[in-house]
């Protein structure tokens, strides 16, 4: 327990009490808007000297506090002028400058070499594919979990105040979130809320990433602790300020709901992977152990983050019977039976042996759905032309379609069966031919007859050429059986995400 207390006790160097004054510095807005540091953003066309920028920002913030945002709508964009300028425009600038300011404390940790997340096991996408290759076949169950979102934006502010000890900055953040909350209400147009979220993606991305960072720092720390993690130890999930008082409350809730204290034994084979607002816990344990982890996680979210993570958002799947959709792949572990004849003296007998084999398959139906949304084919997978590209040159059109196929083929190079990529290649090649035919106002057949199919083939064979250069002795048939993970993949392909 003392170790938990030392971990949850914040370092004084992490408390930043003077973040708010940075909002009044002009260079913050220059950094936030990528303007030169010598340009004045607020004083351009106003006529004041640079020394008055602090006064202008202060007046703008004061006026923003005095607005009635319940009566605010998207049609007010030309009203509420200040110094002859749109106050809403300047409030947007202040918000972006504020986001740049609150990111500073966390950037300092990177510059100083400090780690907010105390774990050596959080890695990039580069380690996920070898994890699938080496570890997945030895596991039995997987928990497929949707990361819950805050039911109220105030929870994000409460979590952030552990790191930014600045009441003024947090109050300003509450104001912006309150403005968003009102724009998202029923009495205002939905377009206003959408526009606010779209213009301030950096703010919400920061809050979401901080939310995930705080969650992982505690979850992974607790995961690595005692050999027997009893449910009574879950008091460490609770708010740092009310550590001891909340333990009793948690035990009452837990005892009331479950009547018995469950034990969660340390599972040395558990693996944690987060991606696309989800995460998985893959384990070699039994179904009972996975159900205990499920209860553990539900209480973790509810008691520490005050989020009701419904058990229905956590799915327990047995890998031998279920193929989870993971990073654009259908991953499965199947038994590959084999018979071995053994002979001892004059007696011979057959020995049955089942070897686990890990398979990654390209999900063709979701892939076609993604291509259909991008207007490369219809819902049935029939290629269609791309009218918006018809004004480009022939080489640019072919190169764009070819790049789409090469990127998808490159991303799914780790698939054990690549026959589905032939379908993707057909869609991209036929859609390129249809677009070119549309541009030249002739039929696809006439276009291919005039130029020949070789023109398209040279743009759609880049991936096979890479394979042949890497493995000169490989045959064409062997290329589509070989599983290769490329380390230059830095993110999930948009068309492969199926989101």
Swiss-Prot record:
Alphabetized UniProt keyword annotations: Chloroplast, mRNA processing, Plastid, RNA-binding, tRNA processing
GO cellular component: chloroplast
Disulfide bonding pattern of the chain: none
GO biological process: mRNA processing; RNA splicing; tRNA processing
A GO term for molecular function: RNA binding
Chief location: plastid
Pfam family, one: MatK_N
Localization in the cell: Plastid, Chloroplast
Origin: domain of life: Eukaryota
Family according to the record: Belongs to the intron maturase 2 family. MatK subfamily.
Record's function text: Usually encoded in the trnK tRNA gene intron. Probably assists in splicing its own and other chloroplast group II introns.
Protein name per its UniProtKB record: Maturase K
């Amino acid at each position: 327990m003392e170790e938990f207390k030392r971990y949850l006790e914040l370092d004084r160097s992490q408390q930043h009490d003077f973040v708010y004054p940075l909002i009044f510095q002009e260079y913050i807005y220059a950094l936030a808007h990528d303007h030169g540091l010598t340009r004045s953003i607020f004083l351009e066309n106003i006529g004041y000297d640079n020394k008055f920028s602090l006064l202008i920002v202060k007046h703008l913030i004061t006026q923003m506090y005095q607005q009635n945002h319940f009566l605010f709508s998207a049609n007010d964009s030309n009203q509420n002028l200040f110094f002859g300028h749109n106050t809403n425009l300047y409030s947007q600038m202040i918000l972006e400058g504020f986001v740049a300011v609150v990111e500073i404390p966390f950037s300092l940790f990177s510059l100083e070499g400090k780690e907010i997340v105390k774990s050596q096991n959080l890695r990039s996408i580069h380690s996920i594919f070898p994890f699938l290759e080496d570890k997945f076949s030895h596991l039995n169950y997987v928990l497929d979990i949707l990361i819950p979102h805050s039911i109220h934006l105030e929870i994000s502010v409460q979590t952030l105040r552990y790191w930014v000890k600045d009441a003024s900055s947090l109050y300003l953040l509450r104001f912006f979130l309150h403005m968003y909350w009102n724009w998202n209400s029923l009495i205002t147009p939905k377009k206003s809320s959408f526009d606010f979220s779209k213009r301030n993606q950096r703010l919400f991305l920061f809050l979401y990433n901080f939310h995930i960072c705080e969650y992982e720092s505690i979850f992974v720390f607790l995961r690595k602790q005692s050999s027997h993690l009893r449910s009574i130890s879950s008091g460490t999930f609770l708010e740092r300020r009310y550590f001891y008082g909340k333990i009793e409350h948690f035990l009452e809730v837990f005892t009331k709901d479950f009547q018995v204290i469950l034990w969660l034994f340390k599972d040395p084979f558990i693996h944690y992977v987060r991606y696309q607002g989800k995460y998985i816990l893959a384990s070699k344990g039994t179904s009972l152990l996975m159900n205990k982890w499920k209860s553990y996680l539900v209480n973790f979210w509810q008691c520490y983050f005050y989020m009701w993570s419904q058990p229905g958002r956590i799915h327990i799947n047995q890998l031998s019977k279920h193929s989870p959709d993971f990073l654009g792949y259908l991953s499965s572990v199947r038994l590959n039976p084999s018979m071995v004849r053994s002979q001892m003296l004059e007696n011979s007998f057959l020995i049955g042996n089942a070897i686990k084999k890990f398979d990654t398959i390209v999900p063709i139906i979701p892939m076609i759905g993604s291509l259909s949304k991008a207007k490369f084919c219809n819902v049935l997978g029939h290629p269609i032309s791309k009218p918006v590209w018809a004004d480009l040159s022939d080489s640019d059109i072919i190169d764009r379609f070819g790049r789409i196929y090469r990127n998808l083929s490159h991303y799914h190079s780790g698939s054990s069966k690549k026959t589905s990529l032939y379908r993707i290649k057909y869609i991209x090649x036929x859609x390129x031919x249809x677009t070119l035919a549309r541009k030249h106002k002739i039929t696809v057949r006439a276009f291919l007859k005039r130029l020949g199919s070789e023109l398209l083939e040279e743009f759609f064979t880049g991936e096979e050429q890479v394979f042949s250069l890497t493995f000169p002795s490989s045959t064409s048939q062997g290329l589509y059986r070989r599983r290769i993970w490329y380390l230059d993949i830095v993110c999930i392909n948009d068309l492969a995400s199926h989101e």
